[in-house]
Swiss-Prot record:
Phosphatidylinositol-4,5-bisphosphate (PIP2) potentiates the activation of KCNQ channels by enhancing the electro-mechanical coupling of the voltage-sensing domain (VSD) and the pore-forming domain (PD). In the closed state of the channel, PIP2 is anchored at the S2-S3 loop; upon channel activation, PIP2 interacts with the S4-S5 linker and is involved in channel gating. Calcium suppresses KCNQ2 and KCNQ2-KCNQ3 channel currents, with calcium-bound calmodulin inducing a change in channel configuration which leads to the reduction of channel affinity for PIP2 and subsequent current suppression. Pore-forming subunit of the voltage-gated potassium (Kv) M-channel which is responsible for the M-current, a key controller of neuronal excitability. M-channel is composed of pore-forming subunits KCNQ2 and KCNQ3 assembled as heterotetramers. The native M-current has a slowly activating and deactivating potassium conductance which plays a critical role in determining the subthreshold electrical excitability of neurons as well as the responsiveness to synaptic inputs. This is Potassium voltage-gated channel subfamily KQT member 2. Changing residue 279 to S: More than 50% reduction of wt heteromeric current. Ratio of 1:1 and 1:1:2. It comes from Homo sapiens (Human). Residues 114-123, 184-196, 254-263, 277-287 are extracellular. Residues 600-609 have a biased composition (Basic and acidic residues). Changing residue 230 to L: Reduced sensitivity to PIP2 and voltage sensitivity of KCNQ2 channel. The lineage of its organism: Eukaryota, Metazoa, Chordata, Craniata, Vertebrata. Residues 402-422, 442-488, 598-619, 659-680, 693-757, 838-872 are annotated as: Disordered. Changing residue 327 to A: Decreased voltage sensitivity of KNCQ2 channel. No difference in PIP2 sensitivity. Keywords: Cell membrane, Disease variant, Epilepsy, Intellectual disability, Ion channel, Ion transport, Membrane, Phosphoprotein, Potassium, Potassium channel, Potassium transport, Transmembrane, Transmembrane helix, Transport, Ubl conjugation, Voltage-gated channel.
């Protein structure tokens, strides 16, 4: 069973496996790999396992595998020489200036060697100078070939061969070989041969060419010519046409009379010398025709031959200005990089962020803790002591306080109780003073490691161990310290805290290194890594904030315009940025509001691909889509309502009147089915009055046609409305036809005084109370669903109505109608309309076939209801 710890180590199981030995190598003389100072190793038989890339130390760290010092010096020297020869900066120009003076001196001496007065004196100096030049150039060439290996593309013999094929390297080897050959073959008693001197002069020109190693001059010329190639080609082409035409015409004019123009080649030579404004004067036209032609073409051709000079001059000026501006822009790189770095550290050192550790680790490696003070035991005074090295501290603790840093130590006799505790920084052991350790439980390492110090001291030879420390380490495997290296540069400046297992209430001041303290017991201590203190973190945070502000100010200063062109470019860039933002804003507005209809050609016929336009993703397009869906739903609802009306037999006029009502109708009152059933059982005749979808009047549900007819005296009305109509449907609650649901009339019809005929209908029902002969059978009445609609009209419709006015029922009369089913006459009929010429008080609805109604005599429960007076 293998258990992994938090630090990536592997702890062996208790059964059948070898125990690992954990120790600080370098503290114990007999420990393996004692050359590694302060390295905490896990000595075991297992091979080192492969770790991730993130867990590997940096290449520059001291803990990683260092290359030999010879290789490091080799690479460093190689890079240095390559930069001096190929990329000279600073003082490296001194060498190149020396080479230039050497080459220039050789050129001057070679010139003086051609003069008879100075020939003898210059030949001796030139010979010596040529030897020096050859030696310098030869050494420089081989150094260049060797130093080119610092570049990855020039490594190896193939890379060196590739570097040697460069144009300037070819020129170098040619000059070197030719100079050696000239000196070897042409020198006889320090006197050069004439042919050797001539070849040497030519080699001086090649030496001057090689002075521009980086080719900046040729690159600048090539860039200018390439940038203005069209203008140059145009000027040269027109100038060449002028040259040919002028030479040919002058040749024709001067051919027979001037000996200077015997051939067309002579005319071309004259034209070239004339148009380039050189004018040797060896050839010139003599006739007036030739002079006139020469003057005309000279005025035209000279301007075109002079154009390339102006084009190249302006191009060079613009290029130089651009290079200066580019250098000015390159100066912004360092402030920009510093601003980015300081901004990241300002962000990463936020104390509320707990997920960023690399920046704090950088400060843990680089921040040096200041000097700390301590009181000496002998003199009782305070003095400054530099920070101790980690290794020296651990050795002192190990040798003086009896610390054990090995998990499986060899058996040794336990120390006596009187063994002295010589730990100078142990705060858990009582001493002779009453103060705690002066380090205040924290010790920081010094920047440099003292590896070899104290190895041979007698303190390192005596090793004491604490049984309590060994027992605690064996009992709690989770407290095994992590495997980290003191020699690693990235961890060389970690902070340590000393924890004492015993109480520190009676602890006294520890002595400085070199002083002994007698103690009764050993000092079990534990070293664990600790982060930076909160105060130090706050200080680092403040420094990062200040650096960020300073970097921001420097970067703003570097953004100042260089010249007027820079200002114009900044304004142009701002204008382009503004236009792009306006375009983006316009696109967003178009996406929200929607674009207008696109202007298309009327004559152009739409193809099959253009028949269906894509959906508009804008808000207006979506609203249009929703509107179309609402219209589609409205059509579907109209279709369903029409089907329902046709199925139930509802006339369309009622629905139109209902939907045309100005005021919403209140909810109809609810009547229980039991009450309605009791009325039906008692009287067997029910008048169901409902409100249709288009009317506020009454509906009289009479017996179905299948019921036996009843002989009743006709009414005085000329046309009683007794024909049945099909019902509108069942009750909303799902009951049978006995349910009576009488909605209240609208608000404008609730007043009894609004119409004169409001009490007439109630009197008609009272008169029908004692006529049981006209009562239909109960079963037929329950199944009947016919109704007569009495629509309500306003004053405008009153004039257009058939009878001149209509009868409306008030709410009180409708309530009386529900409570007086037993008093309805058997042959009573409710007339929804009144004939022409008949008033509402002319006659009774039924002939006197029974006793007079109770309302006429004022007796009975409805005696207070009287007839309404005639309208006047």
């Amino acid at each position: 069973m293998v258990q992994k710890s938090r630090n990536g180590g592997v702890y062996p199981g208790p059964s059948g496996e070898k125990k690992l030995k954990v120790g600080f190598v370098g503290l114990d003389p007999g420990a393996p790999d004692s050359t590694r100072d302060g390295a905490l190793l896990i000595a075991g038989s297992e091979a080192p396992k492969r770790g991730s890339i993130l867990s590997k130390p940096r290449a520059g760290g001291a803990g990683a595998g260092k290359p030999p010092k010879r290789n490091a010096f080799y690479r460093k020297l190689q890079n240095f020489l390559y930069n001096v020869l190929e990329r000279p900066r600073g003082w490296a120009f001194i060498y190149h200036a020396y080479v230039f003076l050497l080459v220039f001196s050789c050129l001057v001496l070679s010139v003086f060697s051609t003069i008879k007065e100075y020939e003898k004196s210059s030949e001796g100096a030139l010979y010596i100078l040529e030897i020096v030049t050859i030696v310098v150039f030869g050494v420089e060439y081989f150094v260049r070939i060797w130093a080119a290996g610092c570049c990855c593309r020039y490594r190896g013999w193939r890379g060196r061969l590739k570097f040697a094929r460069k144009p300037f390297c070819v020129i170098d080897i040619m000059v070197l070989i030719a100079s050696i050959a000239v000196l070897a073959a042409g020198s006889q008693g320090n006197v050069f041969a004439t042919s050797a001197l001539r070849s040497l002069r030519f080699l001086q020109i090649l030496r001057m060419i090689r002075m521009d190693r980086r080719g900046g001059t040729w690159k600048l010329l090539g860039s200018v010519v390439y940038a203005h190639s069209k203008e140059l080609v145009t000027a040269w082409y027109i100038g060449f046409l002028c040259l040919i035409l002028a030479s040919f015409l002058v040749y024709l004019a001067e051919k027979g009379e001037n000996d200077h123009f015997d051939t067309y080649a002579d005319a071309l030579w004259w034209g070239l010398i004339t148009l380039t404004t050189i004018g040797y004067g060896d050839k010139y036209p003599q006739t007036w025709n030739g002079r006139l032609l020469a003057a005309t073409f000279t005025l035209i051709g000279v301007s075109f031959f002079a154009l390339p000079a102006g084009i190249l001059g302006s191009g060079f000026a613009l290029k130089v200005q651009e290079q200066h501006r580019q250098k000015h822009f390159e100066k912004r790189r360092n402030p920009a990089a510093g601003l980015i770095q300081s901004a990241w550290r300002f962000y990463a050192t936020n104390l509320s962020r707990t997920d960023l550790h690399s920046t704090w680790q950088y400060y843990e490696r680089t921040v040096t803790v200041p000097m700390y003070s301590s009181q000496t035991q002998t003199y009782g005074a305070s003095r400054l002591i530099p920070p101790l090295n980690q290794l020296e501290l651990l050795r002192n603790l190990k040798s003086k306080s009896g610390l054990a840093f090995r998990k499986d130590p060899p058996p040794e006799p336990s120390p006596s109780k009187g063994s002295p505790c010589r730990g100078p920084l142990c705060g858990c052991c009582p001493g002779r003073s009453s103060q705690k350790v002066s380090l205040k439980d924290r010790v920081f390492s010094s920047p440099r490691g003292v590896a070899a110090k104290g190895k041979g001291s007698p303190q390192a030879q005596t090793v004491r161990r604490s049984p309590s420390a060994d027992q605690s380490l064996e009992d709690s495997p989770s407290k095994v310290p992590k495997s980290w290296s003191f020699g690693d540069r990235s961890r060389a400046r970690q902070a340590f805290r000393i924890k004492g297992a015993a109480s520190r209430q009676n602890s006294e001041e520890a002595s400085l290194p070199g002083e002994d303290i007698v103690d009764d017991k050993s000092c079990p201590c534990e070293f664990v890594t600790e982060d930076l203190t909160p105060g130090l973190k706050v200080s680092i945070r403040a420094v990062c904030v200040m650096r960020f502000l300073v970097s921001k100010r420097k970067f703003k200063e570097s953004l100042r315009p260089y010249d007027v062109m820079d200002v114009i470019e900044q304004y142009s860039a701002g204008h382009l940025d503004m236009l792009s933002r306006i375009k983006s804003l316009q696109s967003r507005v178009d996406q929200i509001v929607g674009r207008g209809p696109a202007i298309t050609d009327k004559d152009r016929t739409k193809g099959p691909a253009e028949a269906e336009l894509p959906e508009d993703p804008s808000m207006m397009g979506r609203l249009g889509k929703v509107e179309k869906q609402v219209l589609s739903m409205e059509k579907k609802l109209d279709f369903l309502v029409n089907i329902y009306m046709q199925r139930m037999g509802i006339p369309p006029t009622e629905t139109e009147a209902y939907f045309g009502a100005k005021e919403p109708e209140p909810a109809p009152p609810y009547h229980s089915p039991e009450d309605s059933r009791e009325h039906v059982d008692r009287h067997g005749c029910i008048v169901k009055i409902v409100r249709s979808s288009s009317s506020t009047g009454q509906k009289n549900f009479s017996a179905p046609p299948a019921a036996p007819p009843v002989q009743c005296p006709p009414s005085t009305s000329w046309q009683p409305q007794s024909h049945p109509r099909q019902g509108h449907g069942t009750s909303p609650v799902g009951d049978h036809g006995s349910l009576v649901r009488i909605p209240p009339p609208p608000a404008h019809e609730r007043s009894l005084s609004a119409y004169g005929g409001g009490n007439r209908a109630s009197m008609e029902f009272l008169r029908q109370e004692d006529t049981p002969g006209c009562r239909p059978p109960e079963g037929n009445l329950r199944d009947s669903d016919t109704s007569i609609s009495i629509p309500s009209v306003d004053h405008e419709e009153l004039e257009r109505s058939f009878s001149g006015f209509s009868i409306s029922q008030s709410k009180e009369n409708l309530d009386a109608l529900n409570s007086c089913y037993a008093a309805v006459a058997p042959c009573a009929k409710v007339r929804p309309y009144i004939a022409e010429g008949e008033s509402d008080t002319d006659s009774d609805l039924c002939t006197p076939c029974g006793p007079p109604p109770r309302s006429a005599t004022g007796e009975g429960p409805f005696g207070d209801v009287g007839w309404a007076g005639p309208r006047k």
